[in-house]
């Protein structure tokens, strides 16, 4: 009997060890299929819990308020020029690039920020919106859709879905929102996430629906990380290729690219087409990769970044 108990106990310990090893390996796999492995990746999101009705989403989970303040501290808040569209990273490692580009686009003086980013889970409708507010560093950011019933109705009459749950751990919106909350806490946001499969036709319809809001007091913030799964040198090369495609307005070609080029091909292509209809010209502000932040000795896969303005 004792031998049987010992055998069962050993089997139990073996199974427990296997479960722990499996759990550890799953915990190290990054935040999703479109993110690269390595130190520069985003952590796995926590399980989504139901938000408290009417409460803002805390930006602290995306970027700590003290880190936002540190990034913003050396940057001037006022710029003479303003932009209609700005493309920024949502990887917190490159928050200085995002902050600088937002400020250079005139974010301190805008009334509305339409933040459009990739749906990293790549689930649900091709376009999803939220009417939940955000809060960063004690500064609340109101959501335009919380009170603008006409815009919400116009958006959701098409194929767009209203789903606050999809935004609870979505850093493509949360990271830029954490910066905007401290740059311009009196502004409003309108968060939108798009699946990779977003078509140019769906993108055109989205911008057509948003047209009544797109004036000089609105800034479109396209939240995009560029190449994934490549070495530092290869990622630099992809940045050059992407810059050329964007400056040449090759939207159809961009829409067909994979995550070794960017994480939001459909959305970026739709944005490029909208910019062309408005006769806006792209200017590349900065190019970088995660290796630029992590040091020359970093030889694992990296994410790359571009900041772009459209005027």
Per-region residue spans from a language model:
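N-terminal secretory signal peptides that target proteins for export/translocation
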Residues: 1-10
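Short, hydrophobic alpha-helical membrane anchors of single-pass surface/secreted proteins
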Residues: 12-15
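Active-site histidine-anchored catalytic micro-motif
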Residues: 32-281, 285-292
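Long, Lys/Arg- and hydrophobic-enriched amphipathic alpha-helices
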Residues: 288-311
